[in-house]
């Protein structure tokens, strides 16, 4: 996600310097006042922000002053943010066919204690969404960790000061309240760690968005990022979600069948509560005629930018009109039936159902390759289901849960899996291949051309489909497309091969166009004219 239909902007070196001269004067004055107050300090282009609480720098748990730089983060044991695997998780990302890969991901073991782990997936959008996603990936976990350590050792009231008191996101939206950020099963008995961690999440997300707003080298006016994150400590699982990336869990039911449980809600503008908040702040929510299933957020008096999510970091052109950066926090007590958790961007969920994703991870030859197997299947599904569309970026984190298994048994099972020569293909993926091979080979090229490429959106659901956390047991049959290519053909296709989707249309985009007039002020120069 992250392609902008109205602008193909080359990324500027170091993301440029200073605010764009085309920004509205009000935006530039507000940002300049924040910098003069000492609210933010540049991280030197690729570094990590160093804004703190009450103008003071946050200190990470390692004892050093300020926040951690990229060099310091790279030395943290148990932290992985590139394709690979750790002791408990694996992660993989692949660039789509829309341009720069705007997805980012991270796994951080021994996060706060020896039995805690942090996982996150971030999907950038807009001209500089890749910068925003990477900044959030590097800075947000440090903030959560720092605030969590502090709140666990001191009374919560001692941390309430001018920069974090009151509403979680009162500067961006007057209607934001705790009700926008938390949901949990009433039957769940919340542990002691939940309240401090929940408060740390809210504060960290607010500080993260404030840094992006005032950062002098990252243009976030029409660029932003989603964030789906989790913190697991022992058997306690806390999930924080912002945007339309998704977290699901593979667990066993009463009959010992592997099922998929959705842990987050896709926070899109078609949800009644999200739409009501946006409209209360004078923002508009509607879908275009050529994609009636995709609700978008628009400015009050301008048909831009058309953001396809209701919450996000950045996108400050919409922060006065209902877009918020308050995460939705949920808690779950893990059981021995829970096997793994999948965090992924919408590039995966656009083409695969929750059950399909769970089956693919369960059938992976080894834990270290599970995330890559899911990304590969998503890429192949894009080519099979939407041959005239450009595939989206895909990023996946798989966290494996071991409750009753010993480390020796885990290592033994992984060794056996790695020696397996044949990779098992889940029934759901095999079914797609079978349908295409048997039923679609006779479709003529003329019929293929007339089939609409923007017919379905698998990320966006109706209200009745989104709100339940657990997915219905009966999965929807995958839609057929006009392609006669088999799954084996797609597997053997080289990544460098120019396939037909390169010349096709781009499916559902996060951002449609950039605003040209804001608050009655004309942009002095074009968005493209940057130095």
From Swiss-Prot:
Domain PPM-type phosphatase: 88-401
Cofactor note: Binds 2 magnesium or manganese ions per subunit.
Top-rank lineage group of the source organism: Eukaryota
EC class: hydrolase
Gene3D superfamilies referenced in this protein's UniProt entry, alphabetically: PPM-type phosphatase domain (3.60.40.10)
Necessary cofactors: Mg(2+); Mn(2+)
Gene Ontology biological process terms, A to Z: regulation of intracellular signal transduction
InterPro entries: PP2C, PPM-type-like_dom_sf, PPM-type_phosphatase-like_dom
CDD domains referenced in this protein's UniProt entry, alphabetically: PP2Cc (cd00143)
Catalysis performed (reactions): O-phospho-L-seryl-[protein] + H2O = L-seryl-[protein] + phosphate; O-phospho-L-threonyl-[protein] + H2O = L-threonyl-[protein] + phosphate
Keyword line: Hydrolase, Magnesium, Manganese, Metal-binding, Protein phosphatase
Single GO MF descriptor: protein serine/threonine phosphatase activity
Annotated positions binding Mn(2+) 2: 123, 346, 392
Feature: compositional bias, Low complexity: 10-25
Sequence similarity: Belongs to the PP2C family.
Protein name from the UniProt record: Probable protein phosphatase 2C 66
């Amino acid at each position: 996600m992250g392609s902008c239909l109205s602008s193909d902007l080359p990324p500027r070196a170091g993301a440029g310097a200073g605010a764009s001269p085309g920004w509205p004067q009000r935006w530039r004055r507000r940002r300049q006042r924040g910098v003069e107050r000492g609210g933010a300090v540049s991280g030197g282009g690729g570094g990590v922000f160093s804004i703190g609480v009450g103008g003071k720098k946050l200190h990470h748990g390692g004892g050093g002053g300020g926040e951690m730089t990229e060099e310091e983060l790279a030395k943290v044991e148990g932290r992985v943010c590139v394709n690979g695997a750790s002791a408990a998780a694996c992660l993989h990302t692949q660039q789509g066919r829309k341009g720069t890969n705007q997805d980012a991901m991270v796994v951080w073991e021994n996060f706060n204690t020896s039995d805690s782990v942090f996982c996150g997936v971030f999907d950038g959008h807009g001209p500089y969404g890749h910068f925003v996603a990477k900044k959030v990936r590097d800075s947000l976990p440090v903030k959560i960790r720092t605030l969590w350590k502090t709140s666990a050792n001191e009374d919560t009231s001692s941390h309430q000061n001018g920069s974090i008191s009151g509403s979680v996101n009162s500067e961006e939206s007057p209607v934001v309240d705790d009700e926008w950020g938390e949901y949990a099963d009433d039957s769940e008995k919340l542990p002691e760690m939940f309240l401090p961690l929940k408060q740390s999440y809210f504060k960290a997300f607010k500080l993260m968005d404030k840094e992006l707003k005032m950062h002098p080298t990252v243009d976030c006016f029409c660029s932003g990022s989603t964030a789906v994150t989790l913190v697991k400590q022992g058997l306690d699982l806390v999930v924080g979600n912002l945007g339309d990336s998704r977290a699901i869990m593979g667990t066993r039911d009463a009959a010992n069948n592997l099922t998929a449980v959705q842990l987050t809600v896709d926070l899109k503008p078609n949800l009644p509560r999200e739409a009501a908040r946006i409209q209360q702040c004078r923002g508009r929510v509607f879908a275009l005629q050529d994609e009636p299933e995709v609700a978008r957020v628009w400015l009050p008096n301008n048909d831009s930018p058309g953001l396809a999510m209701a919450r996000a970091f950045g996108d400050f052109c919409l922060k006065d009109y209902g877009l918020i950066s308050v995460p939705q926090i949920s808690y779950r007590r893990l059981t021995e039936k829970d096997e793994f958790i999948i965090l992924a961007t919408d590039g995966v969920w656009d083409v695969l159902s929750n059950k399909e994703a769970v089956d693919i991870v369960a059938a992976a030859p080894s834990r270290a390759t599970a995330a890559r197997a899911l990304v590969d299947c998503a890429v192949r599904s894009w080519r099979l289901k939407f041959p005239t569309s450009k595939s989206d970026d895909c990023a996946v984190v798989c966290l494996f849960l071991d409750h009753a298994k010993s480390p020796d048994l885990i290592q033994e099972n992984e060794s056996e899996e790695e020696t397996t020569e044949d990779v098992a293909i889940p029934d759901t993926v095999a079914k797609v291949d079978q349908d295409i091979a048997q039923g679609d080979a006779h479709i003529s090229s003329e019929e293929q051309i007339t089939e609409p490429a923007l017919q379905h959106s698998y990320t966006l659901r109706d209200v009745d489909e989104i709100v339940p956390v657990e997915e219905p047991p009966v999965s929807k049959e995958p839609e057929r497309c006009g392609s006669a290519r088999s799954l084996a053909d797609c597997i053997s296709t080289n990544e460098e091969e120019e396939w037909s989707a390169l010349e096709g249309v781009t499916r559902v985009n996060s951002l449609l166009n950039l605003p040209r007039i804001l608050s009655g002020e004309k942009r002095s120069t074009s968005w493209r004219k940057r130095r």
